[in-house]
């Protein structure tokens, strides 16, 4: 599960039970993102900001360069390429918790059925488009571990703000930068140009308010939904407003 800093606790990060599964999962998830980025903006990273962001994420997750290049060529040449579509589902968990699911799929019927099953088994329900997304703000989010950064906080803040960041926060063990979605790439690339290591860098959904679950059964039910979504390879990201 995710941590308890100001921003990082709003996204249930997909995790697997062991390192081998985690490696396979990372390649699967990012491989699909590469395919979609190439489809939307072409195979040249210099002319495709979304692809640059995905490549940066792939490298941050230790994906080999040849795997990245093979994914780009495969998507660009349509050689055995799968046509993935981006789909979003919104719904409710116990006690009105809001959940957003983003998936990349080659079979929307299969994915919709699996997502609906995950909600139902956790005593939740899938709603209509827009039923909970208004409770979240789409933002770029960059987290920098203090242990991995030698730069002074003020200098780091100026680099981020000059590049277009909206906000800069210092936590106990990290710096957290937020941006508008359209400014995310510029801020990430400005930090990258200064050789600043980023623990994570992505466009995410930040909840405007949080829901606390005090009933043990509610917690177990929501956890069941999140676990089932974790196990679905079509699901890329799950966002919620549970204050863990």
Language-model segments: residues:
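Positively charged, low-complexity, intrinsically disordered RNA-binding extensions
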Residues: 141-244
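N-terminal cationic and glycine-rich segments that engage phosphates or anionic surfaces
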Residues: 1-127, 132-143, 183, 240-243
């Amino acid at each position: 599960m995710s941590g308890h800093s100001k921003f990082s606790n709003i996204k249930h990060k997909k995790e697997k039970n062991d390192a081998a599964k985690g490696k396979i999962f990372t390649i699967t998830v990012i491989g699909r993102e590469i395919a979609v980025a190439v489809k939307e903006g072409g195979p040249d990273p210099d002319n495709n900001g979304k692809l640059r962001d995905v490549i940066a994420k792939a490298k941050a997750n230790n994906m080999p360069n040849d795997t990245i290049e093979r994914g780009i060529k495969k998507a660009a040449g349509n050689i055995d390429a799968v046509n993935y579509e981006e789909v979003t589902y919104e719904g409710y968990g116990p006690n009105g918790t809001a959940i957003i699911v983003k998936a990349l799929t080659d079979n929307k019927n299969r994915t919709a059925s699996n997502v609906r099953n995950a909600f139902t088994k956790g005593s939740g329900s899938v709603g209509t488009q827009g039923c909970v997304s208004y409770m979240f703000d789409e933002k770029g989010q960059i987290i920098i571990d203090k242990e991995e950064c030698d730069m002074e906080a003020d200098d780091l803040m100026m680099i981020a703000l000059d590049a277009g960041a909206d906000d800069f926060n210092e936590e106990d063990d990290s710096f957290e930068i937020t941006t508008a979605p359209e400014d995310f790439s510029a801020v990430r690339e400005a930090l990258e140009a200064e050789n600043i290591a980023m623990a994570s860098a992505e466009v995410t959904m930040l909840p405007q308010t949080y829901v606390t679950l005090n009933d043990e059964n509610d917690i177990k039910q929501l956890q069941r939904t999140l676990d089932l979504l974790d196990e679905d390879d079509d699901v890329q990201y799950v966002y919620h407003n549970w204050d863990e």
